From Swiss-Prot:
Family: Belongs to the AB hydrolase 3 family.
Active site: 110, 183, 218
Family matches, as Gene3D superfamilies: alpha/beta hydrolase
EC number: 3.1.-.-
Protein name (Swiss-Prot/TrEMBL): Family of serine hydrolases 1
Organism: Saccharomyces cerevisiae (strain ATCC 204508 / S288c)
InterPro entries registered for this protein in UniProt: AB_hydrolase_fold (IPR029058), FSH-like_dom (IPR005645), LovG (IPR050593)
Molecular function terms from GO: hydrolase activity; hydrolase activity, acting on ester bonds; lysophospholipase activity
Length: 243
């Protein structure tokens, strides 16, 4: 009898690639490898031009970005959420899963975490016959929101993506949220908003929906005291679901 090695799919952030995300998440990756978990890092399909950036970058730094092959994204950035088009990024991940899956779980960072949340919710529809993920790790993740006209000062999921971020009541996936208290790119309040969607869908079950805040910024934590309990939750969810 052959033992199947658990497999996790990793989706990098804006202006990264799989290789860079592998390096940035080396602490978690190495602990998972020790636990005999396979980590697959893939590249986003959208190749950005300098004009696509939501901030200024000098020519020298942009050339270095091109040389390092990190001018990548899962979708083009927009401050107006209903203008976002995730179809190309979504298709590339779905095609990879169909060719290389099934996967036991998914890990996303920032833009990759927004996409991985949607894939977690919709995996059975996107890839027919693929089981629900056992675990989904959302690092500096966020949803696509807009001002709620019925509740001034509050946000709601943008109508275009309401179905994408809808959590099914029978979801069995363990959700693990990681975010930085000092994150300026994706403020922790945005990650907590997404966390609350899942927590509410699971009737407040904090054994199925976990949150870990670290003191850093827009990054994957690598300090052992922070990541050890996270990796333990990942590996235990893989084992529980296999038993």
């Amino acid at each position: 009898m052959t033992v199947q090695i658990p497999k996790l799919l990793f989706l990098h952030g804006f202006l990264q690639n799989g290789k860079v995300f592998s390096e940035k998440s080396s602490g978690i990756r190495k602990l998972l490898k020790k636990a005999n978990v396979q980590c697959d890092y893939i590249d986003a399909p959208v190749l950005l031009e300098k004009k696509d950036l939501p901030f200024e970058m000098d020519d020298e730094k942009w050339q270095a970005t091109l040389d390092a092959d990190v001018n990548r994204a899962w979708f083009y950035h927009s401050e107006i959420s209903h203008e976002l088009d995730i179809s190309e990024g979504l298709k590339s991940v779905v095609d990879h899963i169909k060719a290389n899956g099934p996967y036991d779980g998914i890990v996303g960072f920032s833009q990759g975490a927004a996409l991985s949340s949607i894939i977690t919710n919709k995996i059975s529809e996107l890839v027919p016959d693929h089981p629900q993920f056992k675990v989904s790790v959302v690092i500096s993740g966020y949803s696509f929101t807009e001002p709620d006209p019925e509740h001034p000062g509050e946000l709601r999921i943008t109508e275009k993506f309401r179905d994408s971020f809808a959590v099914k009541p029978d979801m069995k996936t363990k959700m693990i949220f990681i975010y930085g208290a000092s994150d300026q790119a994706v403020p922790s309040v945005r990650s907590k908003y997404l966390y609350d969607i899942y927590l509410k869908a699971q009737n407040g079950n904090k054994e199925k929906v976990l949150a870990y805040e670290h003191p850093g910024g827009h990054m994957v934590p690598n300090k052992k005291d922070i990541i050890r309990p996270i990796v333990e939750q990942i590996t235990s969810s893989l084992q529980e679901a296999s038993e």
